[in-house]
Design a protein with these regions (language model features):
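Polytopic membrane enzymes that build or remodel cell-surface glycoconjugates and lipids
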Residues: 1-431, 437-448, 452-455, 482, ...
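Boundary/linker segments of alpha-helical solenoid repeat arrays
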Residues: 414, 447-448, 481-482, 515-516, ...
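Register position in tetratricopeptide repeats
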Residues: 425, 459, 493-494, 527, ...
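Terminal, low-structured helical/coil segments at or just beyond the last alpha-helical repeat
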Residues: 533-563
Length: 563
């Protein structure tokens, strides 16, 4: 393939992708982790060495993703909280990834049509919208860039083992990818898969050179389990046979969504049991999975020359998606569309190979068939791009986003509660209240909705109802520090300072790093002229990263004997 054709292919891919994802540039933040990573993340708001150090020693939203968070810090320095800038950056990274994918599969397949097919469907597949249109999922498009780059560097090394610099480069890119998203831990196994594809013998050298990769993968796997440990309990609600069924369901889900990306949703919740049993589609999934396996085996037997590609593609898919197939359960969703960002490349490779086979055998030398084939390909690309373009609008803002989720999951209290939060953020308290009430109709014990109603009553000045709902929230979750803190605020507003201090202390007992409680109890002691005690609480708040008006702190400090 000459350079002009390569350039033309890349320009087509980038143009189609840019059009498909253009709506994301106009999108806002959504109230789903965007606050934790960007809006309320104080560490990105001052680009200092101290904050950079904290970024690399802190997990965000139960994940260790310092490189992704560092990219937000750079953006905040330049663009502040302009959401369009963050969305544009995500799209730029996705465009870069699409180009790298083309390059990678051009090296692997030595076929320009196959690499074009894989790249364009990677670029515009609707299942990948979540990775690009969601600001908080920057880690996906960023880790993929270094992950794929590491693969290409390793392929260069395979061509000439004397070129150790490419092996070193592969390790460096792998490290950066790991610091961006722990899902990169699958790479060492993918390198063995590349060895297989290039028919390299598994000898001593091939194993030794991968030891650094495995050491890094093991370390970051342990780190991921530690930082995401709070998400593991969800799957413990199901028995071992049921979790096994989930494996088959996930495999079937991802396989069918490759060809039929319909009924997409930002969150796919775990199923509710009916009379103690999982829904029928889950029970059926092991049998469907078996049929898929039979199909793949049949193809590999019938088309021997493509057997290596089939094995490579299937193993690539399972190796790269293995960290989120939940052998070690993480997260609150049974499946997630963003998890397919890199894994789908393996399946795209298989499909592209068979499309090429069909083209060569039945289309290539027949003018009419060739025209029909190109027309069909254009229609598929256009319709896929349009589906992606439509899906991008779902991420317009929090209200539209959660309304789409509620449409797909009408019995989910979390959807109503989250849409209520979106209404709350723009000051539409009436709609927020209605959504919180709807959440409680579905689940009367929903902690978030109960707490949020308390907040609404507090804002409206209805302190009696606020106290009632706050106490109700505490009954539902006794270790809810924020609820105690909020109750302390209400007591302070109505002049019950001793009760307020008691509630703030209760909040601190449940969360020793709950900064607002330290600040508020410190302020109460300031009003009571107990400057020693006030200083201790305010100083602790500052040590934890809290912000206090400097005049207040200096006054308390000067009058305190503890300074």
């Amino acid at each position: 393939m000459n350079n002009l054709k390569i350039l033309l292919a890349i320009l087509i891919i980038l143009s189609v992708t840019s059009i498909s994802y253009f709506p994301t540039i106009e999108n806002d933040f959504v109230n789903w982790d965007d606050d934790g990573y960007v809006i309320k993340n104080e560490l990105i708001k001052e680009f200092t060495f101290k904050n950079i150090k904290k970024i690399f020693t802190t997990s965000f939203v139960s994940m260790y993703t310092p490189i992704a968070v560092l990219s937000y810090a750079v953006e905040y320095k330049i663009f502040n909280l302009n959401p369009h800038a963050y969305h544009t950056t995500n799209l730029i990274f996705h465009l870069l990834n699409s180009t790298v994918v083309f390059w990678l599969f051009l090296i692997l397949s030595r076929n320009n049509k196959i690499s074009f097919f894989v790249s364009i469907f990677f670029a515009i597949h609707p299942m990948h919208v979540e990775s690009v249109a969601w600001i908080a999922e920057r880690k996906d498009v960023l880790y993929a860039l270094f992950y794929l780059g590491s693969m290409i560097a390793y392929l260069r090394y395979l061509k000439n083992f004397d070129q150790k610099k490419y092996l070193i480069l592969s390790i460096i890119l792998f490290i950066i990818s790991l610091f961006t998203k722990p899902m990169a831990v699958s790479l060492p196994f993918v390198l063995f898969l590349l060895d297989y594809y290039y028919e390299r013998k598994i000898e001593k050298r091939a194993i030794i050179e991968k030891i650094p990769f495995f050491v890094l993968a093991i370390f970051f796997s342990i780190l991921a389990v530690y930082t995401e440990s709070d998400a593991i309990e969800r799957e413990l609600l199901y028995s071992f046979p049921e979790t096994t069924v989930f494996f088959f369901y996930r495999s079937c889900f991802y396989f069918f969504k490759l060809f039929m990306p319909l009924n997409l949703s930002a969150i796919h919740p775990y199923p509710n049991k009916i009379d103690g049993l999982l829904p029928f589609k889950f029970i059926l999934s092991p049998f469907i999975f078996t049929l898929i396996v039979i199909l793949l085996i049949s193809l590999s037997i019938r088309f021997k020359k493509h057997r290596k590609t089939i094995i490579f593609g299937v193993l690539f898919f399972y190796i790269t998606i293995a960290p989120v197939l939940q052998f070690i359960p993480v997260g609150q969703a049974i499946v997630a569309e963003r998890y397919t960002y890199i894994p789908y490349l393996g399946l795209f490779f298989i499909v592209a190979t068979f499309v090429q086979h069909f083209y060569d055998d039945y289309v290539k030398n027949r003018a009419i068939f060739k025209a029909l084939f190109l027309l069909l390909f254009f229609i598929i690309v256009a319709s896929t791009g349009y589906m992606t373009w439509q899906r991008c609008h779902i991420w317009r803002d929090g209200i539209i986003f959660w309304s789409d989720f509620i449409k797909n999951n009408p019995n989910s209290p979390a959807g109503y509660n989250s849409r209520g939060n979106a209404h709350f953020l723009i000051g539409d308290y009436r709609k927020a209240f209605n959504d919180y009430r709807n959440a409680l109709k579905i689940d009367p014990n929903h902690i978030g909705a109960s707490y949020n109603i308390c907040i609404l009553y507090k804002i409206s000045g209805d302190y009696n109802n606020a106290i009632t709902w706050c106490k109700r929230t505490i009954e539902l979750k006794n270790d809810y520090a924020e609820a105690y803190g909020n109750l302390g605020d209400i007591f302070f507003f109505i002049g019950k300072k001793n009760d307020a201090k008691l509630m703030y202390r209760e909040a601190i007992k449940r969360n020793e790093k709950f900064i607002p409680a330290y600040i508020n109890i410190g302020v109460i002691y300031y009003y009571e002229k107990e400057y020693d005690i006030s200083f201790r609480y305010l100083n602790k708040a500052i040590e934890l990263g809290g912000r206090i008006h400097p005049d207040l702190f200096e006054f308390v400090k000067n009058y305190s004997s503890d300074k």
